Amino acid sequence: MNTHEVEELRQKLLEDARKKSEEIIREAEREAERIIEEAERKWREKAEQEREKIITNARLEAQKIISEARRNYRITISKAKAEVINKILEEAKIRLTNRIGFDIEESLKKLLDEALYYIENPSKIIINPRDRDFIKKVLKEKGLKNIEIVESDNILGGLIIESIDGERVDNSYNTRLERAKSIVLAELNIILWGK
């Protein structure tokens, strides 16, 4: 997957997430405003009925109701954020699983180059079974021989290499997605919600 394709995919996912999150946030804000207005209305009614006697209690009650409304608002927003982020990550996982939007051979070349930086002479390479023909071609192009190719359905794609003495570099899509997750979550939080 080249940088341009990654950027296009990233932009599309961000745009979809932005639209969905704005809609969810608008609805949550309307609901929060309604709850706060209702709380303030209740407070005013109580204050008018027993002006001096209950004004202190009414303010405390109003504050509790407003605090609860704000808490519910924060919960709603947090759920909306989590939902949007999970949908983005799920879409990325689907695209990786189905090999949508990128060149698998180029992807494997780049991942192998990165892994070879840490282990120059791997003895084993673990791949998704669908990538067998691609990795054979890549290994041949790089002049790498005597490497055991192990197929595993436990990885979406990408590769894991191991040295003869047990050193391991995990450059599988699963691991890269997890590594990217914390970075993406922080970036999405800033982009979508300004925090």
UniProtKB/Swiss-Prot annotation:
Q: How does it sit in the membrane?
A: Peripheral membrane protein
**Is NAD found in the keyword set?**
no
List the molecular function annotations (GO) for this entry.
ATP binding; proton-transporting ATP synthase activity, rotational mechanism; proton-transporting ATPase activity, rotational mechanism
GO CC terms? plasma membrane; proton-transporting two-sector ATPase complex, catalytic domain
InterPro entries listed in its UniProt record: ATP_synth_B-like_membr_sf (IPR028987), ATPase_E_C (IPR038495), ATPase_V1_Esu (IPR002842)
Alphabetical list of Pfam families matching this protein? vATP-synt_E
| Family indicated by similarity | Belongs to the V-ATPase E subunit family.
Role description: Component of the A-type ATP synthase that produces ATP from ADP in the presence of a proton gradient across the membrane.
- This protein is called what? A-type ATP synthase subunit E
Specify the species. Answer: Staphylothermus marinus (strain ATCC 43588 / DSM 3639 / JCM 9404 / F1)
Q: List the gene name.
A: atpE
